[in-house]
């Protein structure tokens, strides 16, 4: 399924990863992954979802096109087995390695979405924090603690497809 909407000389098209029409290849200026990669990573072994998404993103981008990523970030000292996406968190090093393996070049990062109060580790899930507050809706004290932390610590990364 693919749609094109024109607004202010901008064409927005969408498709599902793994089913991107070939006529979209090499046409996009940008691809965005906003708090989505943890879901792809957690099912990578069952269906190659992360790899497929990276390959499709690379295919649809024009040379020099960019990929913006906002993702719940696990601290680098956390266990890989925990930071595999199941709890909502991924390590920055994991994302950078996956993007490099797909052919993308790292361009920049921003701390705009960082939250030092979110020190998640084994046993924690991202959905414990606002806005979900999973596990604390009936516990006023725990809910207040989660609200004091605020939303998750998130990495904000920029990559590009090399110019040919």
Where are the language model's segments positioned?
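Short alpha-helix
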Residues: 88-109
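Residues lining the SAM
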Residues: 34-37
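A short glycine-rich, Lys/Arg-flanked "PGG" loop and its adjoining helix->strand segment in the class I
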Residues: 47-63
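Conserved catalytic loop of SAM-dependent methyltransferase domains
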Residues: 110-132
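Conserved class I S-adenosyl-L-methionine
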Residues: 41, 65-90
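Single conserved hydrophobic/aromatic residue that forms the stacking wall/gate
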Residues: 1-12
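C-terminal lobe and adjacent flexible extensions of AdoMet/dcAdoMet transferase-like proteins
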Residues: 102, 141-164
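A short acidic, Gly/Pro-enriched loop at the edge of an enzyme's catalytic core
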Residues: 21-32
């Amino acid at each position: 399924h693919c749609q094109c909407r024109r607004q202010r000389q901008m064409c927005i098209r969408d498709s599902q990863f793994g089913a991107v029409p070939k006529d979209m290849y090499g046409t996009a200026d940008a691809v965005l992954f906003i708090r989505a990669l943890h879901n792809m990573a957690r099912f990578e072994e069952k269906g190659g979802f992360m790899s497929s998404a990276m390959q499709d993103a690379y295919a649809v981008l024009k040379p020099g096109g960019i990929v913006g990523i906002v993702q719940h970030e696990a601290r680098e000292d956390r266990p890989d087995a925990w930071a595999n996406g199941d709890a909502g968190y991924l390590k920055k090093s994991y994302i950078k390695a996956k993007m490099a393996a797909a052919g993308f070049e790292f361009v920049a990062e921003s701390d705009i979405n960082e939250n030092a109060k979110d020190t998640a580790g084994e046993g924690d899930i991202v959905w414990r924090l606002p806005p979900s507050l999973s596990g604390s809706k009936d516990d006023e004290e725990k809910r207040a603690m989660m609200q004091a932390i605020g939303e998750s610590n998130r990495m904000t990364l920029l990559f590009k497809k090399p110019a040919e």
